Swiss-Prot record:
This is Ferredoxin-2. Keywords: 2Fe-2S, Chloroplast, Electron transport, Iron, Iron-sulfur, Metal-binding, Plastid, Transport. The keyword Metal-binding applies. It comes from Phytolacca acinosa. GO terms for biological process: electron transport chain.
Length: 98
C-alpha cells in the first residue's frame, strides 16, 4: 500500500509520522508512541475529533460527523485513512461541540 506523511499538530507540539494508506491515522500515531485522545474507536463519538488543515482523508467508516462537518475539515482520527500527505490539528473535541 502507499504511505503518506501525516502531521499531527497537538497542544504539546507537532509530530510527523508515516502512515500506510490502509491504516487509520490514530493507530499509526499510537504505533509511534504519540498519545492522542479517543474513546469508542468506531467513528461514533467525537473524542478523537481533529481538524484537517492540509491534505485529505477517507473516513467513510465513521458515522458521527455529518457532511457539513466533514466538508469543513473535521475528522475522526480513529476511522480516517490518509489519501494524501495530510496535516491534522488534534484535541479539537471542544471546538467541534461548540
Amino acid at each position: 500500500a502507499a504511505s503518506y506523511k501525516v502531521t499531527f499538530v497537538t497542544p504539546s507540539g507537532t509530530k510527523t509520522i508515516t502512515c500506510p494508506a490502509d491504516t487509520y491515522v490514530l493507530d499509526a500515531a499510537e504505533d509511534t508512541g504519540l498519545d492522542l485522545p479517543y474513546s469508542c474507536r468506531a467513528g461514533a463519538c467525537s473524542s478523537c475529533a481533529g481538524k484537517v488543515t492540509a491534505g485529505s482523508v477517507n473516513q467513510e467508516d465513521g458515522s458521527f460527523l455529518d457532511e457539513e462537518q466533514m466538508e469543513a475539515g473535521w475528522v475522526l482520527t480513529c476511522v480516517a485513512y490518509p489519501t494524501s500527505d495530510v496535516t491534522i490539528e488534534t484535541h479539537k473535541e471542544e471546538d467541534l461541540s461548540a
